[in-house]
Design a protein with these regions (language model features):
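Bacterial N-terminal signal peptides that target proteins for export
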Residues: 1-9
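N-terminal signal peptide c-region/cleavage motif recognized by signal peptidases
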Residues: 18-20
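Gram-negative and organellar
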Residues: 23-427
Length: 427
């Protein structure tokens, strides 16, 4: 592993040395990065089964930002390789690719459409949270290589341009699948649409109203077998919500982006209709000092809701949904020590609540209700050094703890991480 890591880092070091000599590459840009990290629980298993390991992640990215008259074409593609020092059976290639066309007409009509796809190793609590039901086929052990593939297409349209009054609408289609055959219960499809309006009373204050509708299939439940082949039924769900939004530039150093609304969800996997208040808040404060403070809050049914993207999925519903109600909180503080050195501290908390989830129990031959709560707390401290405009070096350490209390085998775990990342960009 040591020689492998050095071999990977060598070309990056040469690139860092030559960073100031490259010519402008517009409209293209490229990035290469190397991450070396140590985790005390690489598979996010229960504490009594955890294994520590060193992991190397090598990634190469290419991007395009091309103006096409009044429109713009954006595209990016990347490939990465994860290598484990001890558990080399988990070594894997991953990728990401996406394209988007931002268009506008002579009038105030504009929009965007595009697609993206990605593939990566599934890690419990990182890529998404699976649901483990009683007396269903045992999901793939987290120590087995299980690749998660996501596909997503979208379209947006807006009328109003920079004027005070805007009308907008959009739609998304998403699909997620897993490579392990006995993990297919977590495969998901989702279609969503949204429409709304915004009104700016001033350049610093914008109000909005948006409605969202989505339907999908999740989870897939085994209800029996025929000829030794499991019979799976896809649970269908529908979610409807209405949200009021506000964007406020309170001062030159304070920006608030918030929403509050009401959601109803029906699902074959739920014993009754779920109704709850949803919302989000992102507040950024940059006082006249070296500090930047960001606070995020969110309440939703997004199964993909993560602490690194608190506000995703409220305005544009492209996150996959699930049968849990999720509350999240995020705090991030950055201190600019010098023009090239930043210190960063972040903390997050998530609370997922499952109630009256109905699933077919193959042992009893009838539906049973399961419920529970999953709570995850994490923090990370890091230092970021930017020796040149196109080079970065970041090192840090953190800890994540999850507590599961449920009738569907939501186990607890803890993971300590130490990580360093070196990156170079060519623009």
């Amino acid at each position: 592993m040591k020689n492998k890591s050095l071999a990977i880092l060598s070309p990056l070091c040469l690139a860092l040395y030559a960073a100031g000599a490259h010519a402008a590459l517009e409209p293209f840009s490229f990035k290469a990065s190397e991450t070396i990290k140590h985790e005390s629980n690489v598979n996010h298993e229960p504490d009594q089964f955890r294994n520590a390991d060193w992991i190397s992640n090598t990634e190469f990215l290419a991007a395009l930002d091309q103006a096409l008259g009044r429109s713009k074409l954006l595209a990016d593609a990347g490939v990465n390789y994860n290598a484990y020092k001890k558990e080399d059976s988990l070594n894997s290639w991953g990728y990401h690719a996406g394209a988007e066309l931002d268009w506008e007409t002579i009038g105030d009509l504009n929009g965007a459409f595009g697609a993206d796809t990605s593939r990566r190793r599934y890690i419990q609590g990182v890529t998404s949270d699976e649901i483990v039901f009683p007396n269903q086929p045992t999901p793939t052990p987290v120590t087995e290589l299980n690749m998660q593939t996501d596909h997503h297409v979208f379209g947006r349209i807006r009328l109003g341009g920079p004027s005070r009054w805007q009308l907008f609408a959009g739609g998304d289609a998403s699909r997620r699948s897993f490579s392990a055959s006995n993990f297919h219960s977590n495969d998901e499809r989702q279609w969503s649409a949204n429409a709304g309006t915004r009104y700016a009373t001033s350049p610093d204050l914008v109000f909005g109203l948006v409605g969202n509708y989505m339907r999908g299939e999740f989870p897939h439940v085994t209800v029996g077998s025929f000829g030794g082949v499991p019979i799976e039924v896809a649970s269908k769900f529908r979610t409807r919500s209405v949200d009021g939004t506000v964007q406020l530039q309170a001062s030159g150093s304070s920006m608030l982006d918030a929403s509050v609304g009401y959601t109803t969800q029906t699902s074959d996997a739920l014993a009754k209709e779920v109704k709850f208040v949803n919302g989000s808040m992102n507040w950024t404060w940059t006082p006249p000092s070296h500090f930047t403070v960001k606070v995020g809050l969110k309440r939703s049914s997004d199964v993909d809701t993560t602490t690194t993207a608190v506000n995703n999925g409220v305005r544009y519903s492209n996150n996959l949904n699930g049968p849990s109600i999720n509350n999240l909180a995020l705090l991030n503080v950055t201190y600019a020590l010098t023009a090239k050195v930043n210190l960063d501290a972040s903390a997050s908390y998530s609370h997922r609540k499952y109630a009256d989830v109905s699933v077919f129990d193959t042992g009893l031959g009838q539906n049973v209700l399961v419920d529970g709560t999953v709570r995850t707390t994490s923090f990370f401290l890091s230092a970021h050094y930017q020796p040149t405009r196109t080079t970065d070096l970041t090192c840090g350490a953190g800890r994540e703890v999850r507590h599961g209390d449920a009738t569907f085998a939501a186990f607890s775990y803890a993971d300590n991480t130490v990580r360093c990342v070196a990156a170079i960009r060519f623009e």
